[in-house]
Amino acid sequence: MTTINGGTVFDFTQRNRPVSKSVIIEDLNDFSSIHYLGSGAKGVSSSNPYKRIVFVLSGQLECTNRTTGHTWTCPEGSFTIFPGNCTTGFSAAEDTVALRIVVVNPTEIYSILEDEKAYDLKQLVPEQEDSSVFIHILSCGNTKIWAVTMVEGKFFEAETLNSNMVYMCLEGEVKITYQDKERILHENQCFYCLKDNGIHLQAGASPTRLLIMKDIL
């Protein structure tokens, strides 16, 4: 399993280098992993009862439901849901990095989301003047995922977190204060915050969009 220290700024897309026609898998925990697909890579996921939600962090993923023959494209900055109980295929014409979460016994998936469609994370949450907007994408055991849009100057904070959290900047920039130190996150960068710590986030541009992920590490 991957070990990332709390208080670390990192970029999932830079942790491994994709290899041509190959897939490198970095396990984050029992249910989530990063997949590094080199150009020309192809693969098949055998049928299992669980849905899988896949976030394409760079590149582009070509997806196939091999049971029905349906195909769809998931470009960089988007995500898709693979249905359970079917065999799925995927390929990448260019180097591609994706975060995959196996959805075991979900308690909630955002109601508008359908299987086998690509959703642009930057368009999922509308920008609202003088507001921060949160959409709860997924709850699955301890894992929870939110998409957030903030306008410049807006902030939110937690005095004490009860779980480990990853904050990923999708657009704009965000200033993070953690353990009395400030960091600036830019697009594609992540910050790992350990439970029992407080955190303060402030948007440095309009719009600033984040993906917040609980207990994926």
Question: What is each stretch, according to the model?
Answer:
Residues 67-84, 179-196:
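Short acidic-glycine-tyrosine-enriched beta hairpin
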Residues 1-38, 42-44, 71-76, 80, ...:
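A short, N-terminal "cap"/entry segment at the start of jelly-roll beta-barrel domains
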Residues 48-63, 150-151, 160-175:
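Short, conserved beta-strand element in jelly-roll/cupin
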Residues 26, 42-48, 65, 72, ...:
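Short histidine-centered beta-strand/loop micro-motifs
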Residues 37-39, 56, 74, 82, ...:
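Hydrophobic residues in beta-strands and at strand termini
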Residues 41-43, 62, 78-80, 84-90, ...:
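Histidine-centered metal-chelating micro-motifs
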Residues 84-109, 195-217:
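Ligand-binding loop in jelly-roll beta-barrel domains
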